[in-house]
Regions:
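Active-site flanking residues adjacent to catalytic metal/cofactor-binding acidic residues
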Residues: 7, 79, 100-102, 148, ...
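Internal, well-ordered alpha-helical segments in soluble enzyme and binding-protein domains
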Residues: 23, 118-121, 141, 157
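Phosphate/diphosphate-binding glycine-rich loops and adjacent basic-rich segments that engage nucleotide
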Residues: 134-155
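Cofactor-binding loop segments of dinucleotide-utilizing enzymes, especially the Rossmann-like FAD-
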Residues: 9, 100-102, 127, 150, ...
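A short secondary-structure junction signal
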Residues: 108-111, 133-136, 156-161, 201-202
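Catalytic cores of soluble, metal-dependent hydrolases
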Residues: 2-75, 87-90, 158-267
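Catalytic metal-binding/acid-base residues of hydrolase active sites
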Residues: 82, 103-105, 151, 195-197, ...
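Active-site histidine-anchored catalytic micro-motif
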Residues: 70-135, 144, 229-232
Length: 267
């Protein structure tokens, strides 16, 4: 696995979380590859969740950029999905995005009912919200993005998805969506929030909801992506080991890592 670099990001909104912060390390141990850990933000006189989170995003950008420069495939293991901004920026070239998630992560400060920053990750990546904080980070045109297997969205989020014409797909329609995306981009960032899995298969976190993908469906989706695109970087996010007492998620993560970079990850 010498061509893969695992980039652990064990920070939840810029801070340590008693359960979620363990997730990246557990996944890294299961996958087994060269690993770096992204440092947390410098302490501030007055804690600032947003500023701390963007500090982490920029640290991810640096770690991914270094991996690419070293000829390594960057596989990010993160708590928060908004780390995707750092990953795409670190790759340093135009990419499409394929986003697997039970949720849309497509809110902005104007649409969110909760103010939860990680519920805005995909929206920020496609150019909406927090413009000043995003300075110097890349955005991806929404028409170069696909949201897969999302099934738990608030009404205001659904309205935003429709207004922005974000392409959505499920297990039955994802190949057609990938075909359309392949007419626009050659390389993609693949984002897998592990709660895309149906909780009957494995419960990734407390936000897991029924109606998700099984492992075979997710493997088939990744094979379809490999057949159409270069995968420039990928992420596995939002794993809470306290919700997975049987240890199913790390085993699945190994399978997914092999599908994401089959020529780079040993069997």
């Amino acid at each position: 696995m010498s061509d893969v670099r695992l980039i652990q990001v064990p920070w939840y909104l810029g801070r340590e979380h008693p359960d979620l912060s363990r997730g990246p390390g557990v996944l890294a141990e299961a996958i087994g590859a060269e690993t770096v850990v992204v440092p947390g933000p410098e302490p501030r006189p007055v804690p600032n969740e947003v500023a701390d989170s963007f500090d982490v995003i920029r640290s991810v950008r640096s770690a991914v950029s270094e991996a690419v420069a070293d000829g390594r495939f960057p596989l990010v293991l993160a708590v928060n999905c908004f780390t995707s901004l750092g990953t795409v920026a670190g790759v340093g070239r135009d990419l499409g995005v394929i986003w697997f998630d039970a949720h849309g992560d497509f809110h902005t400060p104007d649409s969110t009912p909760t103010g939860f920053l990680d519920g805005m990750g995909f929206a920020m990546l496609t150019g909406d919200g927090w413009q000043e904080m995003r300075q110097g980070l890349r955005s991806v045109p929404v028409q170069n993005s696909v949201l897969v297997a999302a099934r738990d969205l608030e009404p205001t989020e659904v309205a935003r998805v429709e207004a922005r014409a974000l392409r959505r797909a499920d297990a039955d329609t994802l190949e057609a969506a990938f075909d359309v995306l392949a007419t626009r981009v050659d390389a993609v960032y693949v984002h897998i929030d592990l709660d895309v899995l149906d909780p009957s298969v494995a419960r990734a976190n407390v936000l897991s909801v029924e109606g998700g993908l099984d492992v075979a469906q997710l493997e088939e989706a990744l094979t379809a992506i490999q057949g159409r695109f270069e995968i420039a970087a990928a992420a596995l996010t939002a794993f809470d080991p306290s919700q997975d007492p049987e240890g199913r998620v790390p085993e699945i993560a190994v399978t997914l890592a092999r599908r994401l970079a089959p020529e780079k990850v040993a069997s």
